[in-house]
C-alpha cells in the first residue's frame, strides 16, 4: 500500500527533487472543495501504482514558498516530478481512470540520464 505523505517547504527538496522515484505532489488547501474531490482519487491511484510513484500533499496555505516557486495559481494542482524535474502539471479535477493512464505512461517512460 502506498500512502500519501504530507510535505512542507522544508521537506519538499529532499522528498521530491532528490528522489530517484517519480513523485506526484498535490498542491491543495483545506477550504478548497475540488481539492477534497481529488483526495480519494489520489488515494486510490496511489494504491494502484503500488510504490512505482511517490504521492504527496502540500498545503499551499501553510507552505507558500514552494507554491510560489512553482507558480501555483489554482488548486488543486498536481505536479509530477521525475529525476528532480517537473514533467507534467494537472490543474483541477481529473477522473481516476484518466489520471492512472497519464501516470502509467510516465512510469513506463525510460529514465533519461
Show which residues each predicted segment covers.
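Conserved helix-turn-beta segment immediately C-terminal to the redox Cys motif
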Residues: 20-22, 39-58
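Conserved Rossmann-like nucleotide-binding pocket used by diverse enzymes
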Residues: 3, 8, 28, 54-56
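Conserved redox-active cysteine motifs that mediate thiol-disulfide chemistry
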Residues: 27-41
Amino acid at each position: 500500500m502506498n500512502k500519501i505523505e504530507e510535505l512542507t517547504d522544508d521537506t519538499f527538496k529532499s522528498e521530491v527533487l532528490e528522489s530517484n522515484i517519480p513523485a506526484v505532489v498535490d498542491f491543495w488547501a483545506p477550504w478548497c472543495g475540488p481539492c477534497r474531490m481529488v483526495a480519494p482519487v489520489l488515494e486510490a491511484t496511489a494504491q494502484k501504482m503500488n510504490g512505482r510513484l511517490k504521492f504527496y500533499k502540500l498545503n499551499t496555505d501553510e507552505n507558500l514558498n514552494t507554491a510560489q516557486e512553482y507558480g501555483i495559481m489554482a488548486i488543486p494542482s498536481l505536479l509530477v516530478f521525475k529525476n528532480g524535474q517537473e514533467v507534467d502539471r494537472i490543474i483541477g479535477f481529473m477522473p481516476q481512470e484518466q489520471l492512472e493512464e497519464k501516470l502509467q505512461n510516465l512510469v513506463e517512460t525510460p529514465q533519461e540520464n
